[in-house]
Design a protein with these regions (language model features):
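Short cysteine-rich loop/turn motifs with clustered Cys
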Residues: 2-32, 54
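Active-site cofactor/substrate anionic-group-binding motifs, chiefly glycine-
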Residues: 51
Length: 96
């Protein structure tokens, strides 16, 4: 199990912020923190670069997405990161 920090722990019980149409299960019990992919093999960005993500959207981000380009996958993820950062700032989890 990876080391969790306050950002990754804050995903518990949150609404999915990735929200892929036809994929998202909207189940807050399955929400995890989906980090952006890092700069190298098996690397992840810091936890401020992640999104609250339901289990189905997370599987979609990690795998093949028929009908979508990799750039479209990245865009959905980045939009989720922005929405997540706004929530974390609003809730005092991420302080700028």
């Amino acid at each position: 199990m990876s080391k969790q920090d306050k950002y990754t722990r804050s995903a518990r019980g949150q609404q999915c912020q990735v929200r892929i149409p036809g994929i998202c299960n909207f189940d807050t019990d399955t929400t995890v923190f989906a980090h952006l992919n890092g700069a190298g093999w098996a690397m992840k960005h810091s936890s401020i670069h992640g999104a609250y993500c339901c289990s189905d959207c997370h599987l979609w981000l990690d795998g093949v997405a028929p009908g979508y380009t990799r750039d479209e996958q990245k865009l959905y993820h980045l939009e989720g990161v922005i929405r997540t950062q706004i929530l974390m700032i609003k809730n005092g989890i991420l302080v700028l």
